[in-house]
Amino acid sequence: MKLTRMQFDVLVNLMEVQKAEPTALGISSKEVRMLVNELIKDGLLDETQTVTEKGIAALEPYRTKRVIFLAAGFGSRLRPATINVPKPMVRVHGKPIICSAIEAALQAGIEEIYIVRGYLGECFELLLKKYPQVRLIDNPDYETSNNVSSAMKVRHLMQNAYVMEADLLINNPTIFKKYHYTSNCLGVPVEKTDDWCVISENGYAKQLIKGGVNCHHLFSIYYWTAEEGAKLPAHLEEMFSSEGGRDLFWDIAPMNRYNEHYKIEVRECSFADISEIDTYNELQMLDSAYLVK
């Protein structure tokens, strides 16, 4: 059955905290009671407000099935740390950066993990023993194109999937969710930024730009529903084959060129949730092991 947004939110809230919280849901206690009674009547909850097998089945179309890491780049701004390893495999406090996201995904019950590799790709094989869920996909085009070439290698896997950069240090693993109702991107509300940001309208992304005001600083973590993930292959193929298309970031396709075909919710987080390590100096500030003794 097709769930309404509020039915979905109540079911997921009950699965996560075993109690429908009006504050978390953004509605009144009366509305929560009405929704709970409706879900009990439909057999999605039992009398103790526990999600039933029928309720779990109703949530299945919204379940996150996989995480795709785009990890083929050079990470040149992080040299010398990236001379011998790709940026996602640079260690922070003794652990490769990418492990923070892999472990957060596994904690959320997401079992399929794909890593598109390129520069020093063999280094990612070190992950296979600890994380047997990981599947490695090679991108031989990483030297001559932007990350759109990595997205092209996995374009048919983007349904019910997170698609993200592999060099984000996840400080708050709860940003990874087992269920999503809509496609979304992760962003922090800011008054002004010189970085990549999302211009939104009524909570939905309308454009991705470099530098903006009253916008959302973008963390490149996207979720795609089954319906919208199915649109991505054709749009990526068309952009990739267009003049200059190989030089673009992959998310220019859904966020800019073909945005009218997508409904991408801006999911808010904070700068404390994720660390972006863009330079060697930032790496040193985060982990004193990189300071010259």
How should these model regions be labeled?
Residues L3, V12-M15, T50-V67, L218-K293:
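Conserved alpha/beta core of the MobA/IspD/sugar-nucleotide pyrophosphorylase nucleotidyltransferase superfamily
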Residues F124-W196:
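Conserved beta-loop-beta/alpha segment of the NTase-like Rossmann-fold superfamily
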Residues M1-S28:
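Short amphipathic alpha-helical interface segments
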Residues F8-Q18, A57-R117, G121-F124:
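N-terminal glycine-rich phosphate-binding loop and ensuing alpha1 helix
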Residues P88, Q133-R135, K263-E265:
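Conserved beta-strand segments of alpha/beta enzyme cores
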Residues I40-T50:
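A short, conserved structural fragment
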Residues G26-K41:
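Short amphipathic alpha-helical interaction segments
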Residues D9, E21, N172-G245:
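Conserved core of the sugar-phosphate nucleotidyltransferase
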